[in-house]
């Protein structure tokens, strides 16, 4: 039975359709033509006229209601099947419960925002950044539901008699369709038209700005301009063995570019810190901070930390700094072969917004024979990884959702080793395909954009793509590709990067026959190196060699609209194309 508030929203839908004379009124058949599934869309709405904003509010609210129902269903199945001998089944349901909770948060924020724009007689447009925020949340909500569905489908194959397929997975299919409708109507009704061009993100230019900019800090120095109290500073200096001068900002002084630290705890395996493991330090961090007092810093000294760490959504504004790549190492060995879902195989997982990691190695040692085994998964909005390394084989780095930035990082893997559906930029990184099992190939990326209205994609800018040492010395031939389309609207761009000659001349590989070859968006711009020649590249309809105008859509300010969240961390970045 629908809640009273949902009934109220439904009545409001009819009243607003009468009063909104300043908006273009249409019936559901007309409105639904703009959605991915018009037939399903028409089955959702009342048979009355309204404008796209009213239909959008209605569908987002209904998505929220369905999300609540789904959580109750999952809870019931977890309780009912707690005795099952197949751990993958329970883990898939637990993933779904976790993801559904996040989806509810995203939908509630989205509904409150769009509902505030719809007055009785007029419509108030959203700013460019606010529209991008909501499109990002709806895109992530859709990704969450599809991640759940994939996990359930895989888990259900373990038992032919298990009812999860009909009891949980099938209802979720319709919920996913409804979210696609909500995202499509939001994109049509609220996202500025210029931003919607070809589904690209668009950045409103700042005064005097250019699409070509220079990085403002040195490549790979791994140090941030931190500002902290004398007490906190003494703790940091004693462990890091790095003296922080007053106004430590490369000589710039405290000009607003310093990174404010609210407090610090330390992790050291020899007992000289506050904690001997990272998990305990994370638990000690404050909950739901707004960042106004700065970042909560966890300093992790050198050591091999065999832990599975999850940074929950309430641990906002956390910064974790290690002693360097291959010095501070977080390692695990979970894999799909051993009964974990891909989602929860991650050694390190982060959901909390505004998370920053510096000078840390994240590793999964399961090995190529264990197939999917994630080193790090990020579904954290505004998450940043600076001077870190990620080491595994298949599915090393899961850039799951929301907005992410990687600077001066090393990523090692084999099959689909950078995958997911975030809006993510890799800058000045090193991507190292390594030796897979015999008869396997390497695919650097497997981007998971499943809907044309998702503002997601993978941008690889000013990076170096070279073979890892074990691939160079391999005693059998291995083919390496820039990527393959995991989902129908997969979107990946390589630009201004060095591509070594070991990459196959065709560049890209099919996923399965002609799947997604017309709907994907793969592009290359101004790359160098013996593997960058596009003469013999694939001839798919979705593959492009682009110019600087199109490439600018995949820079930091193109994909993210605003970059203040990066600037406030002190992490260096290039906002546009490199001159």
Curated annotation (Swiss-Prot):
Gene Ontology CC annotation, any one: extracellular region
Region (Pectinesterase inhibitor 7): 22-185
UniProtKB keywords: Aspartyl esterase, Cell wall, Cell wall biogenesis/degradation, Disulfide bond, Glycoprotein, Hydrolase, Secreted, Signal
CDD domains: PMEI-like_3 (cd15798)
Enzymatic reactions: [(1->4)-alpha-D-galacturonosyl methyl ester](n) + n H2O = [(1->4)-alpha-D-galacturonosyl](n) + n methanol + n H(+)
Site (Transition state stabilizer): 394
Disulfide links within the chain: 409-429
Secretion signal span: 1-20
Similarity field: In the N-terminal section; belongs to the PMEI family. In the C-terminal section; belongs to the pectinesterase family.
Protein name listed in UniProt: Probable pectinesterase/pectinesterase inhibitor 7
Organism: Arabidopsis thaliana (Mouse-ear cress)
